Curated annotation (Swiss-Prot):
GO terms for molecular function: ubiquitin-like ligase-substrate adaptor activity. Residues 278-408 form the ApaG domain. This is F-box only protein 3. Substrate recognition component of the SCF (SKP1-CUL1-F-box protein)-type E3 ubiquitin ligase complex, SCF(FBXO3), which mediates the ubiquitination and subsequent proteasomal degradation of target proteins. Mediates the ubiquitination of HIPK2 and probably that of EP300, leading to rapid degradation by the proteasome. In the presence of PML, HIPK2 ubiquitination still occurs, but degradation is prevented. PML, HIPK2 and FBXO3 may act synergically to activate p53/TP53-dependent transactivation. Its main location: nucleus. It comes from Rattus norvegicus (Rat). The keyword Nucleus applies. It is found in: Nucleus. Part of a SCF (SKP1-cullin-F-box) protein ligase complex SCF(FBXO3) consisting of FBXO3, SKP1, CUL1 and RBX1. Interacts with PML, interaction is direct and takes place either alone or within the SCF complex. Residues 10-56 form the F-box domain. SMART domains: FBOX, SMI1_KNR4. Residues 419-464 are annotated as: Disordered. One of its GO terms (cellular component) is cytoplasm. One of its GO terms (biological process) is response to lipopolysaccharide.
Amino acid sequence: MAAVEAETGLLTLESLPTDPLLLILSFVDYRDLINCCYVSRRLSQLSTHDPLWRRHCKKYWLITEEEKARKNQCWKSLFIATYSDVGRYINHYAAIKKAWDDLKKYLEPRCPRMVLSLKEGAREEDLDAVEAQIGCKLPDDYRCSYRIHNGQKLVVPGLLGSMALSNHYRSEDLLDVDTAAGGFQQRQGLKYCLPLTFCIHTGLSQYIAVEAAEGRNKNEVFYQCPDQMARNPAAIDMFIIGATFTDWFTSYVNNVVSGGFPIIRDQIFRYIHDPECVATTGDITVSVSTSFLPELSSVHPPHYFFTYRIRIEMSRDALPEKACQLDSRYWRITNAKGDVEEVQGPGVVGEFPIISPGRIYEYTSCTTFSTTSGYMEGYYTFHFLYFKDKVFNVAIPRFHMACPTFRVSIARLEMGPDEYEEMEEEAEEEEEEENDDSADMDESDESDEDENESDEGEGEERRRRVFDVPIRRRRCSRLF
């Protein structure tokens, strides 16, 4: 061999120095690194070089140096052992595991009871049994997540966020796989849909489509929205929340750990804050965050319900004589068609808060649109405490509200024109009756529902019972 190399002047693989070969192998993926074991004895020896497997352990399994030291195994052994356990999820594991780790790290000091409610991961045989029970394959990223944590115990507050109004409370638990299987839908309108979450107060669930059916894409996550104008119970519209389980779960976690969703009284509230939605007038700053409530909204008839949370703060550096009291509010409300409504009234949510240097006042209220989006803006009128005759206005920044993407039920698309027109007329009559009976209400942050305790056994029974009951969507009056 050496004579051949001397004559030709070529280097063979066997004669290359070790360091360049190890450098080349450090760029090889784990599959090719394994295949190198079968190419030659030299490459087989080099591919067992333990530092080569360190990168793959960190990339695919997020194994840390501390975990390696605790298990007292080499990197290659750790990779192989983990692959033997969850190898089928190698394309999803890192993203899902990171989301779980980030979420728990963020919630442990803020919502410890919520973290304690998480269940241990399910076994492969448990997930296989559920697939046999429902007659459908579960998405791999869903299975991967449930190998890490099999949902949570039925507690309030739920892991998937809360929302509270004066007469309405929602808190969504992440279902364990057995309970989810019990709520698997075979009926028309929700065929092949598996519930991911459940709220014991409203009966609301987010679903994942495990098969493509009735106009849904496979693996889509959505809120169901019954068509209230259709006589066909299979007419169920959908608010799309995520294209896949990974998309749905990781985007939610990112909103939580980035501080996008505020933690209030040990609960995650699903308000979204636009950093540009802030206005400062003198020493007073007003900021707004908003949230869409699918359980109080409908596509047919068009009724989109939003709640907003307003924070009013006076700078700590303001002079004491700048202390003031809110007298009134003015709103200019514009829908997607450009229709404008103006509202003016005393105080906010029945209160006349006093703002002084360093003090923060927050409140929540809500509004509805007949279009899928709209915006609000306006101002507050204050008077100084020490100069009561002196009044001034504080700007409320324009804030936009838009419902998620929705998909209309196939049952509606298959309706005849005569049936559609008849239902439109009936809906308009009902809307007029509701408008005649409705009255303005106000709702304060003081009325946010306190932490709720629920018996897990009773909760499980109720959760299974409600799965087969269509959600009743109540109309709430607009609050300004």
